[in-house]
A protein has these predicted regions:
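Long, non-catalytic architectural segments outside compact domain cores
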Residues: 1-54, 61, 68, 72-102
Length: 102
């Protein structure tokens, strides 16, 4: 029969795994948003404005969704927080550049 200490340790392990999964989700979605931004750049360059606008809208939605997840993330190390802030900035800068094309 597990002790209270065992249950606490298991709870902490599960919580840490969930937090890591959340960070992985944020990183993956930010990369997907960057892909949408690159697709939009290409589409604008080819004159496919509707396709470009759709790609930008998807990237913007992903950006705002991930900001919400990021704001709720707990126990971030300074390094991870800085890494994610840098990725958010890169995406925001890219989206701003792409939107000037449209």
């Amino acid at each position: 029969m597990p002790t209270v200490g065992d249950l606490l340790l298991e709870s902490l392990r599960i919580q840490a795994e969930a937090e890591e999964a959340c960070l992985d989700f944020i990183r993956t979605d930010l990369e997907l948003c960057l892909t949408f931004a690159r697709v939009a750049e290409t589409a604008y360059g080819m004159g496919h404005l509707e396709h470009a606008d759709q790609a930008v809208a998807r990237a913007e939605k992903g950006y705002s969704d991930m900001l919400r997840f990021f704001s709720k993330a707990k126990r971030l190390t300074p390094g991870i927080e800085q890494e994610l802030q840098s990725e958010f900035k890169e995406l925001r800068d890219r989206l701003d550049r792409v939107q000037r094309l449209g």
